[in-house]
Amino acid sequence: MTKLIVICGATATGKSGLALNLAMRLGSVILSADSRQVYREFDIGTAKPTLAEQRAVPHYLIDICAPRETMTVADYQEQAQALINSLPVSPLLLVGGTGLYIRSIVQGMKIPRVAPNYELRSQLASLGQTTLYGILQQVDPIAAQKIHPNDPVRTLRAVEVFYITGIPISAQQGENPPDYPILQIGLDCEMERLTERIHKRTEQMITDGLVGEVEYLCQKYGAELPLLNTLGYQEIKQYLTGEISLEAAKELTVLHTRQFAKRQRTWFRASPQIEWFNADHPDLLDIVCQHIQQP
């Protein structure tokens, strides 16, 4: 029997909705694979499951960190694997769009346990992505072949690990795939339709109180909190400081979310193990259930 069912794909493709319905049908639980939903108080802007949804189906790996804490991929992997090994439910649903979180589980990535050094990161980031990627090519050409030149997050992390340990990150990584069966399901739709979904979700977040959430978080933790510089929060923060109008903030959020979704699609499409389904199919739940039940 399949131990773990992964539901992945770009943002706004309906992963959470499908997972909720699937979990209720299968009597399962949900493990989040979202790098921002792990943080408490960041709710609306991360599209975190509502309290009603959490009551309907048990959710794990959300609200497990304070906003000023750091959750590394290694931290996530350790907690997720512990849950997978201990929860007396099968199958479990691993749901989200954070590719590294999912890869750390399905491929059993061996991850360097190197804590982030924010002072070093600030110094490295100030060099600019082009210069930083050039450094990566020099100190770790193997990692540079795997990291896109326009991926500042992974570039920065790889260079940071080298500067801290003196050992290339590629030499510290490896894989130890789990011995339990995994089924990977991906949701996707045409880019035009995905853009419509992103528009609708952005409007809904504003209606649900995103502006108030950002204002509260800025007052409580300070506007320079790194999480407040992430997608959906940074744009509203610009509105609150008077830099742009609310309409412009919404337009920027849609634009940046669309760009992010394209990167996610590229990431997940590179995995041949993922079976893809049309997110807009009217019988999506039934089709996915049939796929799961196939021998």
UniProtKB/Swiss-Prot annotation:
Task: Name the Enzyme Commission number(s) assigned to this protein.
Answer: 2.5.1.75
> What is a GO molecular function of this protein?
tRNA dimethylallyltransferase activity
According to the UniProt record, where is the region Interaction with substrate tRNA? 34-37
In this chain, ATP is annotated as bound at G9, A10, T11, A12, T13, G14, K15, S16
Residues that hold substrate according to the record: T11, A12, T13, G14, K15, S16
Which reactions are catalysed by this chain?
adenosine(37) in tRNA + dimethylallyl diphosphate = N(6)-dimethylallyladenosine(37) in tRNA + diphosphate
Q: Where is the site Interaction with substrate tRNA?
A: T98
Which keywords fit this entry according to its UniProt record? ATP-binding, Magnesium, Nucleotide-binding, Transferase, tRNA processing
Task: Return one Gene Ontology term, BP aspect.
Answer: tRNA modification
Required cofactors, per record?
Mg(2+)
Extract the InterPro entries matched here.
Dimethylallyltransferase, IPT, P-loop_NTPase
Q: Name one Pfam family in it.
A: IPPT
The record describes its quaternary structure and partners as: Monomer.
Family in the record: Belongs to the IPP transferase family.
Query: What role is this protein assigned?
Result: Catalyzes the transfer of a dimethylallyl group onto the adenine at position 37 in tRNAs that read codons beginning with uridine, leading to the formation of N6-(dimethylallyl)adenosine (i(6)A).
* Official protein name in the record: tRNA dimethylallyltransferase
Species in which this protein is naturally found: Nostoc sp. (strain PCC 7120 / SAG 25.82 / UTEX 2576)
